Curated annotation (Swiss-Prot):
This is L-rhamnose mutarotase. GO terms for molecular function: L-rhamnose mutarotase activity. Keywords: Carbohydrate metabolism, Cytoplasm, Isomerase, Rhamnose metabolism. The lineage of its organism: Bacteria, Bacillati, Bacillota, Clostridia, Lachnospirales. Involved in the anomeric conversion of L-rhamnose. The gene is rhaM. It comes from Lachnoclostridium phytofermentans (strain ATCC 700394 / DSM 18823 / ISDg). Substrate binds at residues 18, 41, 76-77. Its main location: cytoplasm.
Length: 104
């Protein structure tokens, strides 16, 4: 199992909308996340800076990387592009975080 953490940037004033969209996460998006080996997916928000911190556990990182090629992922990115920083392909601007400690 691989633990991944990352940060993303939410636009000012979009916290409630971001949370709403994730509370209503499409069933096919949930299925895709599990199909590609993702679990224990959690996103936190720093309300002072609008920085999102994500954490996910993966069965296989190479398999997970293929989620970006799925139509449902591309559709989700387009859906979220108006409320957060994105790359030209609508994927969220995401910065990987270094794991410096873990305790089971």
């Amino acid at each position: 199992m691989v633990r991944k953490a990352f940060k993303m940037q939410l636009f000012e004033g979009q916290a409630k909308e971001y949370e709403k969209r994730h509370n209503e996460l499409w069933p096919e998006m949930k299925e895709m996340i599990h199909e590609y080996g993702g679990s224990n997916y959690t996103i936190f928000l720093d309300e002072e800076t609008n920085v999102l911190y994500g954490y996910i556990e993966l069965e296989d990182e190479e398999k997970w990387d293929k989620t970006a090629e799925t139509e449902i992922c591309k559709k989700w990115w387009a859906f979220m592009a108006d409320i957060m920083e994105t790359n030209p392909d609508n994927s969220p601007v995401s910065v990987s975080l270094k794991n410096v400690f873990h305790l089971d």
